[in-house]
Amino acid sequence: RQSFTEYDRNVYNAVASLYVYGDPSHIVTPAMVYRAMTGLTDAEKPTAGQLAAVARSLDKMRFIRARIDCTEELKMRHITLNSQQINNGEIDTSLLMAEAVKVKAGGQTVKAYHILKVPILYEYAAAVKQVLTVSASTLDIKELNPDGSAGARLPNTESRILIKGYLIRRIEGMKGKNKLNNPVVALYDYQRDGETHYGLYSITGKVDPTREEMRRIREDAEKMLAYWKATGYITDYEVQTQGKKITGFKITAYA
């Protein structure tokens, strides 16, 4: 059984954006998906390794089965069957309805994907009004110069893509109409109400990280938060500690 990872989630969200806002042919290449995921311009080329990672994710999601309880959506839309209100419903489909195709562009033949249907998770999120939309400039993180101005781009490693995607999802949840109560993004896993909540270390796949890996993840997260504060995406953030141990970041997402 193949798992749906944090990286897959970022790829999936990029595909959904391209389906809804992109070319009406609904044909996407790994390069298009990677650019949408990271905020790169059309003139910037992802590496072969980055493209291969996206292609693996897309191929995997084509064969992952998705079951979604759509009861509330059906009730909200007052959908009936034989004049009777439907009280319970479940969608059973593929996570990504797509077929692999080969297309020729610029004299080169490349692997692409024809997205056959609105990605199911996006469709459901739209139905319950939980679609998250962020600008390309929010995705395109810049390191800040000593004077606070934007400097060079923070390179997109797989770890940084995971950190960025998770932070954005949490921040958008804080900004949403329900305003999530917990403004703290934890670095370590923790238990609440009998459930395990994963911290940034686990989100990046580092269940037992080394000291160097922890330092790098913390620094990357803080660079992103500092950039978003400078550009107005968030209002502020604070480093959370227990003694000398850094445990997370408290984010103020709105004034």
Model regions and ranges:
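Charged, alpha-helix-forming regions
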Residues: 1-255
